[in-house]
Swiss-Prot record:
Keyword match Endoplasmic reticulum: no
Residues where Arginine amide is found: 62
TM segment ranges: none
Lineage: Eukaryota, Metazoa, Ecdysozoa, Arthropoda, Hexapoda
Known outcome of mutating residue 43 to V: In strain: Z24
Role played: Cecropins have lytic and antibacterial activity against several Gram-positive and Gram-negative bacteria.
InterPro entries documented for this protein: Cecropin (IPR000875), Cecropin_insect (IPR020400)
One GO cellular component, as annotated: extracellular region
Any single GO BP term: antibacterial humoral response
Name by which UniProt lists this protein: Cecropin-B
């Protein structure tokens, strides 16, 4: 009977400690994905600006 109580206590401690470490790991992964999204957004904004300038130059060259 005492073994069951000890086992439950140890399992509870392990679950709490693993739960905290998993949250940290998921947070790091989420931040990496967020950073990739920010870089993609910034790159697309730059490309749109360059394409708009090229369209303006082409329109000016046509007259």
């Amino acid at each position: 009977m005492n073994f069951n109580k000890i086992f439950v206590f140890v399992a509870l401690i392990l679950a709490i400690s693993l739960g905290n470490s998993e949250a940290g790991w998921l947070r790091k992964l989420g931040k990496k994905i967020e950073r990739i999204g920010q870089h993609t957004r910034d790159a697309s904004i730059q490309v749109l600006g360059i394409a708009q300038q090229a369209a303006n130059v082409a329109a000016t060259a046509r007259g």
